[in-house]
Curated annotation (Swiss-Prot):
Homotrimer. Interacts with ORC1 (via PIP-box motif); the interaction occurs during DNA replication in trophozoites. Interacts with ORC5; the interaction occurs during the trophozoite stage but not at the late schizont stage. Interacts with FEN1. Residues 61-80 bind DNA. Auxiliary protein of DNA polymerase delta and is involved in the control of DNA replication by increasing the polymerase processibility during elongation of the leading strand. Involved in DNA damage response. The lineage of its organism: Eukaryota, Sar, Alveolata, Apicomplexa, Aconoidasida. Keywords: Chromosome, Cytoplasm, DNA replication, DNA-binding, Nucleus. This is Proliferating cell nuclear antigen 1. NCBIfam families: pcna (TIGR00590). Its main location: nucleus.
């Protein structure tokens, strides 16, 4: 038996909204540590890694390991049934081929049920980029600020250069109409609205990426106020968003995390590199 209750169902509603344009079908691995999803996008260019912790649910039970094949677009539709201030109970019996959802509002006068048919999905095992030794550079900043940077720069080019040293992170595009650059220096947080910028750099890094995917990753600003970027030479960039429940009546704070990975572009002209 698998059974998991989340008091704030809107968190999962936002989560599936964030990844639906990247992932089509995926296997959700359920075990005693929680729910995990790892999947490539449809073009096999980017990778999504999600872990919802068992401790992030107000109730979690998983009697044995399960693999649940789901269509993300269908999950997104299911969670559109969820209204504001509603909880969700997700369950599946061991002998069932369905994943059941029960949404209930906090007044307990509205209950919505849905039974989603599970899929049999044959997917190759994925090798999540391992960086136990740490990244060459890490930057922590406001997720909304990063979203705005990518959205604005995508008006000028389909490629963005990210350059980091201990004193600055630069986002640069080179387009037909001209060149654009946004530079952020380290700064302390001054308020809840100004998270600040933290830069840790072992060496100077400069890489280029398809801005289309960075725009899709940065949609996750609705899940977390802070994003951590991890970069190393010849390795995919990592976007990490910690998923938290900040509602006043939350039983827990940290729900889990979602990570996005994208390999740097390798075919840019040498004139664009140092």
């Amino acid at each position: 038996m698998l059974e998991a209750k989340l008091n704030n169902a809107s968190i999962l509603k936002k989560l599936f909204e964030c990844i639906k344009d990247l992932v089509n079908d995926a296997n959700v691995d359920a075990d005693e540590s929680g729910l995990k999803l790892q999947a490539l996008d449809g073009n096999h260019v980017s990778l999504v890694s999600l872990h919802l912790l068992d401790s992030g649910f107000s109730h979690y039970r998983c009697d044995r390991e399960r693999v649940l094949g789901v269509n993300i677009a269908s999950l997104n539709k299911v969670f559109k049934l969820c209204g504001a201030n509603e909880s969700v109970v997700i369950s599946s019996k061991d002998d069932e081929d369905n994943l059941n959802f029960v949404f209930e509002n906090n007044k307990e006068d509205k209950v919505t049920n849905f039974s989603l048919k599970l899929m049999s999905i044959e997917l190759d095992s994925l090798n999540i980029p391992d960086c136990e030794e740490g990244f060459d550079a890490e930057v922590e900043l406001s997720s909304k600020e990063l979203t705005n940077i990518f959205r604005n720069l995508s008006e000028f080019s389909d490629t963005v250069f990210i350059e980091i040293d201990s004193n600055c992170i630069k986002f640069t595009t080179k387009g037909i109409v001209g060149d654009a650059e946004v530079a952020l220096k380290p700064r302390d947080s001054t308020s809840e609205d100004d998270i600040g910028v933290t830069i840790k750099s072992k060496k100077k890094i400069k890489q280029s990426f398809a801005i289309k995917y960075l725009n899709l990753f940065s949609k996750s600003n609705i899940l977390a106020d802070v994003v951590v970027l991890g970069l190393s030479d010849s390795r995919p960039i990592e976007f990490k968003y910690e998923i938290k429940d900040t509602s006043p009546d939350s039983d827990t704070l940290k729900i889990g995390f979602v990570k996005f990975f994208l390999a740097p572009k390798m075919d840019d002209d040498m004139d664009n590199k140092d």
